[in-house]
Design a protein with these regions (language model features):
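Feature recognizes metal-dependent phosphohydrolase scaffolds
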Residues: 1-272
Length: 272
């Protein structure tokens, strides 16, 4: 059995509940398809949970792919790591990520630092620029979690089997079986809109909510989306009140199931 989850977005309770339904015995394994941070209130704890799980079972059994939110987080850290290390500020600064995080009450940053450190950031935010806040926050995060940040940096962008490609957003399907040779990080992490139709391998991805206009086109739909051809989308918009979806692929009968509340329901083409 191969399990898959994506777009956890800081929702540790939902992750733990889903993992109670995962059997990692035998040859079973699980692939996490990115976007573990932001929006929810437990970003660091989600990453730590996955890191510990991978250390327990090994990287072949627990595959943790990178999402665009992890990459934005890393870009922000790298920019301000450079500023902090050489004392200059004449380089590009990636403020999009931290601005979004502060719009959500600093839900992500606050989980990586102590309460006292967060109080300090809130205090200087009254008079200091976002650049100054970022510089201090990066210094704190690297001091607290340098090994974890290194682990995030090493996350692969896709995982391939004989018949499947697990990825955060998608691949360049126009390239056919040569997709990996021209695959840009932007495509793998941020492809939009979601692709549907026939491909030579099955694509399992997140990134785009299954309720979105490009998929089910139904705001109340938060189950696995299957296009009836080659694509399974598993972002159930958990942080918006949807679901953290758990997909299971039975390698013996080559069928996909949505696992929920202890039941395995065969995934059928959506809307048909």
């Amino acid at each position: 059995m191969i399990y898959a989850m994506s777009d956890i977005h800081g929702c540790i309770g939902e992750l733990q509940k889903n993992m109670e339904q995962v059997d990692l015995g035998g040859d079973n394994r699980i692939v996490f398809c990115g976007d573990y941070i932001d929006y929810g209130d437990s970003s660091y704890y989600v990453l730590k949970y996955l890191w510990d799980l991978q250390k327990k079972y090994g990287a072949e059994k627990v595959v943790v792919l990178k999402g665009n939110h992890e990459q934005m987080f890393l870009d922000w850290i790298e920019d301000y790591r450079n500023i902090y290390s050489d004392g200059t500020e004449d380089c590009r600064t990636f403020n999009d990520w931290i601005c979004t995080d502060f719009e959500y009450g600093a839900n992500t940053i606050s989980t990586f630092i102590s309460e006292q450190q967060m109080d300090f950031l809130n205090q200087i935010a009254r008079t200091c620029s976002m650049e100054t806040i970022s510089r201090e926050a990066v210094r704190m995060i690297l001091s607290n979690h340098e090994k974890l940040i290194w682990w995030i940096q090493q996350m692969p962008l896709y995982f391939e089997t004989k018949s499947q490609i697990f990825v955060h957003a998608g691949v360049d399907e126009e390239a056919g079986e040569y997709w990996m040779w021209g695959a840009s990080d932007n495509t793998l992490l941020g492809k939009f809109p979601a692709t549907k139709g026939k491909f030579y391998k099955t694509i399992i991805a997140g990134h785009v909510g299954t309720c979105s206009r490009d998929l089910a086109a139904d705001r109340s739909y938060h189950d696995v989306y299957y296009d009836g051809e080659s694509h399974y989308y598993i972002d159930g918009s958990v942080y918006k009140g949807g679901k953290l979806l758990l997909l299971a692929y039975d390698e013996e009968n080559e069928k996909y199931y949505q696992v929920e509340n202890g039941r395995m329901v065969l995934v059928k083409p959506t809307g048909i």
